[in-house]
């Protein structure tokens, strides 16, 4: 008689790895039950928003050309505004990725002579060229927009004293990155973000507070826009696309700020009124509908990975028992060989391109070689099972995604299997 264990063995995972994983999984029932409760709340929130905005079959029709009359696009933006409790939203396939969405929001709302402040330290690597920390054509710095950052205190706490000193008459926009990116700091809870925004606005009430919400949507019952963020920004090939959106990004927030984003995305005088959806609306709506459940599966995978690798003695961020504020799990593996082996295991567990061997390469936007494992249906989708990391100290790998918990589990066990095969883990 066939059983689950036989399938894992047939797929190349040795019995010792399977048994070790089963032991860890058995300790996580309460954590998983709590995740399911959050997913249930967020599922109801999404359905309620779709009902309130009268989503109908006509929203899925193909629209081309200028897109002056694109009811699906306009309704989807109403749904996002309803979910995020904002005045407006811009949700478009013409926004190609999370970095594009962030660059758009910044460029649309900053002018020469303004200053951008990051009170949470260095931003994600790809934003360094957007801002001009690393020189790049078309950066904010080229347009006379200055940048200042305040690093976090040891342990990841906000440095309120230096944040207060950094805010000045030129400070126009404060950007807060919720997720850790390629760093080993903690990701921030919505509550922590709310406290930071309240502090910033107590010093300068008219400053724009923008939150990079990538990897954080639907992880908690509330979003940064519920605690004072003027704009929240993210990618549809992460959490809110539910694994079905083939491209896209969103910006939700104050109407005047979103209008500015529309003018920057298309053209002054045109704004949000143009930009046809080109037949992707059904996948955008359906992906959003599935997003709370898909995000829950990814969260379970992250917690499982944390507990597996923590038990083996590795440093993991967050640790196995900490609350979760995004879907990313960082594991400090200590050597380039271990990072590469981990990623090979993730790739081997993929439904697409499982036979491919990932290797480090000089990826545009990064200052070191990066290895990426992602046998995904949508290229670059990080809500699908994926892992990546820069080949530099502390040699940490960043695991995320899994459209289902079961697939995330397979990927994590396969990552461990590859470390065992390479002799990099010798005792379970």
Predicted regions and their residues:
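Conserved PLP-enzyme active-site core in the AAT-like
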Residues: 2-25, 36, 46-59, 67-70, ...
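Flexible linker/loop signature enriched in Pro/Ser/Thr and Pro/Gly
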Residues: 83-86
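A short, basic N-terminal segment
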Residues: 32-40
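Conserved C-terminal alpha-helix-loop-beta "cap" of PLP-dependent enzymes
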Residues: 310-427
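Short glycine-rich or small-residue beta-strand-to-loop segments that form or flank ligand, phosphate
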Residues: 59, 63-64, 90-93, 327-332
């Amino acid at each position: 008689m066939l059983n689950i264990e036989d399938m894992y063995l047939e797929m190349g995972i040795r019995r010792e790895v399977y048994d070790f994983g089963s032991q860890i999984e058995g300790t996580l029932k309460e954590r998983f039950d709590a995740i399911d409760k959050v997913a249930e709340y967020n599922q109801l929130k999404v359905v309620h928003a779709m009902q309130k905005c009268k989503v109908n079959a006509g929203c899925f029709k193909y629209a081309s050309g200028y897109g002056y009359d694109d009811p699906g696009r306009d309704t989807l933006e109403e749904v996002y505004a309803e979910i995020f409790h904002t005045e407006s939203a811009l949700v478009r396939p013409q926004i190609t990725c999370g970095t594009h969405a962030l660059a758009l929001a910044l460029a649309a709302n900053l002018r020469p002579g303004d200053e951008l402040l990051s009170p949470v330290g260095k931003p994600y690597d790809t934003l360094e060229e957007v801002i001009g920390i690393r020189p790049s054509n078309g950066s904010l710095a080229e347009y006379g927009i200055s940048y200042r950052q305040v690093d976090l205190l040891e342990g990841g706490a906000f440095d309120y004293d230096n944040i207060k000193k950094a805010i000045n008459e030129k400070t126009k926009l404060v950007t807060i990155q919720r997720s850790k990116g390629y760093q080993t700091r903690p990701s921030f809870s919505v509550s922590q973000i709310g406290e930071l925004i309240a502090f910033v606005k107590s010093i300068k009430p008219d400053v724009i507070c923008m939150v990079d919400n990538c990897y954080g949507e639907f992880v908690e019952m509330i979003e940064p826009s519920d605690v004072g963020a003027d704009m929240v920004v993210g990618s549809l090939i992460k959490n809110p696309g539910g694994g079905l959106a083939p491209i896209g990004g969103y910006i939700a927030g104050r109407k005047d700020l979103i209008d500015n984003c529309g003018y920057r995305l298309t053209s002054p005088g045109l704004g949000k009124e143009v930009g046809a959806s080109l037949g992707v609306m059904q996948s955008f709506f359906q992906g959003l509908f599935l997003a709370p459940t898909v995000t829950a599966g990814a969260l379970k995978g992250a917690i499982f990975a944390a507990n597996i690798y923590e038990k083996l003695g590795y440093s993991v961020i967050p640790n196995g028992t900490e609350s979760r504020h995004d879907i990313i799990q960082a594991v400090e593996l200590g050597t380039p060989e271990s990072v590469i082996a981990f990623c090979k295991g993730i790739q081997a567990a993929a439904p697409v391109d499982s036979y491919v061997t990932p290797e480090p390469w000089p990826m545009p936007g990064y200052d070191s070689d990066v290895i990426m494992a992602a046998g995904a249906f949508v290229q670059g989708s990080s809500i699908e099972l994926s892992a990546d990391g820069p080949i530099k100290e502390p040699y940490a790998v960043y695991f995320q995604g899994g459209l289902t918990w079961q697939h995330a589990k397979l990927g994590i066990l396969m990552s461990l299997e590859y470390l065992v095969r390479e002799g990099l883990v010798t005792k379970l």
